[in-house]
Amino acid sequence: METTVICLANSKKEGERCIAGIDVRTGQWVRPVSRHTSKGEVPFRERQVAGQEPQLLDLIVMDLAHEGPTGFEYCHAKENRWIDPSPWIKFGAASVADIRRYLACDNQILHSRSKYVCPGVIEAKPLSLRSTLELREVRALQLEQAGGKWKATLTTTEGIDLRGISVTDCHLIEQLNGGWEFLKTGYATLSLSIPWEPPMQDWDEGPVGWKLLAGWIPAQS
């Protein structure tokens, strides 16, 4: 099915990428999922747009199925859609003003106020409420390296804090590794990881979905 998507995430996943955005016809999130990889990560041959990486705010026509995987290994996500064969085509770009209508403002980010959520919490909800992607307006962003990886602490305009979440936005990681300055206010695409259990002796919650900074759009974009 031909689907026009505002790209709001191009992030690291299993050595490849996770792409996500808003279906402009429905206003709903979609996450294209490959049929040819073990965890749905999208290889370059499927995600490329005229030989280039999809960029945040690109308007892209994608061929997506009506359905996708929704099981435990995908954190029971409602947004997943299988990728069908037609190549993706960019035909323009959205502005920051265009995406504001899609901002989430609930008092929890992705089902909890902590940096993770148990998949069972999502599974217990109707499919229409099993969100694993959100766009949030951020009034303060801090980024630091820990264990060789970039971590983000952010405060939304609603006053919700998320501390020490992993940064998976590929472009932002490149900027940080290059020593570039980043704007500390903007719009964050927040996503849930595939469930995994941290190697901690006192951890007793099993595999959980971890919140990720999957896309960062500076306020001045």
Predicted regions and their residues:
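Small/flexible residues
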Residues: 19, 33, 37, 115-117, ...
